[in-house]
Amino acid sequence: MKKKLSKKYSFKEVEANKLLFWQENNLFKAQINSTKKPFTIVLPPPNVTGHLHIGHAYDFTLSDILMRYKKLKGYDSFIIPGTDHAGIATQTKFEKNLKVNAQTNRFNLGRELFLEKLKIWKDEQINYIHKQWNALGLGLDYSNYLFTLDPIVVQTVREVFVKMFNEHIIYRDKKLVNWDIQLKTAISNIEVIHKEVEQKLYYIKYLSQDQKDFVVVATSRPETMFGDKYLVINPKDKRYFHLHNKIFINPINNIEMTVILDDYIDIEFGTGVMKCTPAHDFNDYELAKKHNLEIINIMNADGTLNEKCGEFKGLDRLEARSLIIDKLQKNNHLLKVESYRTSVGFSERTNEIVEPYLSHQWFIKMDSLIKDTIKMQDDCNNKVDFYPNRFNKTLLTWLKNTEDWCISRQLWWGHQIPVWYHKKTNQIYCDTIPPKDLENWIQDEDVLDTWFSSGMWPLLTTKWNYNSHFFDRYFPTSLIVTGMDILFFWVSRMMNFSQYLVEKKPFKDVLIHGLIRDSQGRKMSKSLGNGIDPFDIIDKYGLDAMRLFFASCTTIGEDLNFSTERLGANWNYLNKIWNIAKYIENLDEINDNLNFEDVDKFCDVNKWILTELSKLTLEINKNMDKYNLVVATKYLYDFIWNTFASYYLEYTKVLLQDLTLKNETIKTIRYVFNKILIMLQPFAPNISEEIWLCLNQTNNSILLQEYPIINFEFETIIIDKIAKIILEIRKLRLEENINNRINLCFELISPNDAFYKSKIKLVNLLLILVNAEINEIKKTSSNNYTYELVIDDFILKTSYEKPIDYVFQMKKASEQLNYLENEIQRATNLLNNSGFINKAPAQLIIKEKNKLINLKKEHANLLKTLTDLKQKVK
């Protein structure tokens, strides 16, 4: 039975089962033994915490568009999907679920049972993510799916850790780190959210030991005073230089404090004197290392003050703050308090204020890794290409200022560090397998930062250490699409690991996109309530409309503002394409396809559309190869909506009436539209597939077609001129209210009259569309004409005299009458307004009175004209 397109475009019908159709035909799997050139995209692995947000949809859709494009271009093109165990995010969410649903916590369960339950929950989450991927219509190679805690990944991560440990790249040390007091773990910079908050600035008086001098220090964190043994001044500050090396007394615990010099201190900021708290401030920590200062930790892992804080021991640091201020005030050391706004770091997961905290952690020495990555980027033949290119410079700037990477986390969920400590000797054992006498050893309880395993993602997904055939074919991968917000945390890590482990770049290209913001340009957040669910968009506008929105609004490297108007416009665009397809479906069937040998004999209109199609394919290929989707979609939109639909298909309505042109025209229409569908496929795969299958009466997917590169080039200037003639005649009819039923006859005046005479048959054929014709062509003309249309190198003249349209004139007179009545009422109200009469300048009042007189005269004259017109109509 012949397949038919439904009468109306319904995205729900069109998009149903398309992904299943492609999957059943194995269109998204790697072709390991193919001779095709590979094009591999590694999907950024979403966290296994559940619901995919619009940022995920954006990221994944761009990857899918480019995968489909390359597949149509003849590549072995596929996407490798995966999910990330996401240590902190997953453990935090699961612990909340435990608390709500089971009224317990991980400590009650113990590590083994907790992880067992979490793995079951993780499997449910991954199944949900797979369903969401399918709902997004993504063509993923599930046969190569990977999870960052799969056994092969665990083994690989251990091997890499051991290698780096043995080469002294990984080391353990006590350093200052970002600390979440609720989770009791170190966290990365990306997990710190900075918010502007109002805080108090306390001005505290410090007396010298000999009672002869005092200084004032401003601090927002008086609770950290228990860790202070130094005051710091700028050596260029003449106010305080004489105090260098002098001893002052800490007013909270009476400990001696020494004044030291450092040009880090800003003379103009605050009082110019700074207290130094190395264990609880990153800048102070650097000062301590520089001057070899004592570092005193005054805080426990849960944010309470420790034994160094005397009577305040055991209190939360924020609770203790007010009590400490009370004590300072009673002792006359608090001089004043000011409010000010400042940026404070909060934990993304718990919303707790992040504390700089001194603790034993594992670190990676970054200097050698960074040098190798920078060297790679300096090699034009081996570097990773960034789109846009400015992000290469951004990345290199970051790398040059990178400190050693803290890779340990005080969690249970993740890659447990493969290090054991001897119970008696504290000897360290590091290997991929536990020590033989395991009963004498204790394994390090910490797990690795999620970015450690994610940093090896291109290596892991291409089976680096266990399938050389797959790895050699697909590594380096071709492309990764990601947001600028994780350029340093993820992209740079992948470059570091690949260069270190295999001395190759991990991918050839990186496409960087910005954030999706709301319609007002604001970042989406829970507090603003402006988040957008991609599945709500799909339900309302359809998957293809959303894909077109992402593609047509994506200027690489820039943020994207969400717009329901653009989504609605995309639906209209798809509906237009559907209606075009319906028009083509109803054309007479022509058995033979377009024969290129016959094209030279085609009429100029069909040659023109083939030439325009050739130009289109050139532009789209060029821009798609540069990942410039916004330009590619614009070219395609303009061609479909304007060139093809508004002009060419309109022309074909008269061409199809000519039996000598009918067959070639139907062939051309179908040929051009099929090429349009192939170019549309990456952006709107569902509608293009549905139309392709129906119009071509085939079971073979459009994805098996060849992406068009067409080289028709005909001289078709006459078609451009005809288009201008039609446009000008339509404007003339509209402006002069000339009925479309009236045939307009023109003379064409041009020095190039021979050219136009040679094309007159075609010109008049197409002018049927506007009920007009050219009945004479001359070089010059001296006759008088009613209308003249000046177009390019010719003039169209007609002596048509329009009959007086009394009804039209009545309509215009009535509209003007209404306008005058409104103006008269406005002027009358103004002159009756005592406020205006009393306050306005006399000159302005006179002007308004004269205006009212003239309005009334004009109204009276127009009323008489309207009465006369009504009589004539009768």
Swiss-Prot record:
Residues 805-874 form a coiled coil. It is an enzyme of class 6 (ligase). It comes from the Bacteria. InterPro entries: aa-tRNA-synth_I_CS (IPR001412), aa-tRNA-synth_Ia (IPR002300), Anticodon_Ia_Val (IPR033705), M/V/L/I-tRNA-synth_anticd-bd (IPR013155), Rossmann-like_a/b/a_fold (IPR014729), tRNA-bd_arm (IPR010978), tRNAsynth_Ia_anticodon-bd (IPR009080), Val-tRNA_synth_C_sf (IPR037118). The keyword Coiled coil applies. ATP binds at K526. GO terms for cellular component: cytosol. It is found in: Cytoplasm. GO terms for molecular function: aminoacyl-tRNA deacylase activity; ATP binding; valine-tRNA ligase activity. A motif ('KMSKS' region) lies at residues 523-527. It catalyses: tRNA(Val) + L-valine + ATP = L-valyl-tRNA(Val) + AMP + diphosphate. ValRS has two distinct active sites: one for aminoacylation and one for editing. The misactivated threonine is translocated from the active site to the editing site. The C-terminal coiled-coil domain is crucial for aminoacylation activity. Catalyzes the attachment of valine to tRNA(Val). As ValRS can inadvertently accommodate and process structurally similar amino acids such as threonine, to avoid such errors, it has a 'posttransfer' editing activity that hydrolyzes mischarged Thr-tRNA(Val) in a tRNA-dependent manner. Belongs to the class-I aminoacyl-tRNA synthetase family. ValS type 1 subfamily. PANTHER family: VALINE--TRNA LIGASE, CHLOROPLASTIC_MITOCHONDRIAL 2, VALYL-TRNA SYNTHETASES. Monomer. This is Valine--tRNA ligase. The gene is valS.
